[in-house]
């Protein structure tokens, strides 16, 4: 599969991310087959979000991953998104930190390769978001950060305030 460089951290990933939004109703065996099929095609970049299936998409993926010793964490690039609650956006530091803890628990992994903010939240100061990113990076829970559906000015402000680099995935 063709690869592309993701963001400025110069990590090569498949040009196509495997979307996991509609997988919440799969059985563990079906999910295991899904993961293996993707990996066999060279698609090791899995895209999740804490709201997909109310978290069930991540849970089923995590169960299938954890129960199969042939699946190695280092062979996958796991991305998830946070910041959307039922009926509102929430990028408060508290919500971001709680979301990541839930994501890691559901995916049954110690870290995310990439965390994206799903949508901007105009009610939260960018400094609060940047502080959450710094905590997650320093704790080793998240290796890289990015945004989805943000304007260039919003990205620049977060980059200015955070200790780590933030980027928006390229759209193809």
Predicted regions: what they are:
Residues 18, 46, 61, 78, ...:
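Conserved, mostly hydrophobic/aromatic
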Residues 1-76:
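N-terminal binding-site loop/beta-alpha segment at the start of enzyme catalytic domains
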Residues 58-69, 100-101, 124-132, 151-163:
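Distinct, well-ordered alpha-helical segments
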Residues 27-38, 91-106, 155:
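Short, acidic/polar
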């Amino acid at each position: 599969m063709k690869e592309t460089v993701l963001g400025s951290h110069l990590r090569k990933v498949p040009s196509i991310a495997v979307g996991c939004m509609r997988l919440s109703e799969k059985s563990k065996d079906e999910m295991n087959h899904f993961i293996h099929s993707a990996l066999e095609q060279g698609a090791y970049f899995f895209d999740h979000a804490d709201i997909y299936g109310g978290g069930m998409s991540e849970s089923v993926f995590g169960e299938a991953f954890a129960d199969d010793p042939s699946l190695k964490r280092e062979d996958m690039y796991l991305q998830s998104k946070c910041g959307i609650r039922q009926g509102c956006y929430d990028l408060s530091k508290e919500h971001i930190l709680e979301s990541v803890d839930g994501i890691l628990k559901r995916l049954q992994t110690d870290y995310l390769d990439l965390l994206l903010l799903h949508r901007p939240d105009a009610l939260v100061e960018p400094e609060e978001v940047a502080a959450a990113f710094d905590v997650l990076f320093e704790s080793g829970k998240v290796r890289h950060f990015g945004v989805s559906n943000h304007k260039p000015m919003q990205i620049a402000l977060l980059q200015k305030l955070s200790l780590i680099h933030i980027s928006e995935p390229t759209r193809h």
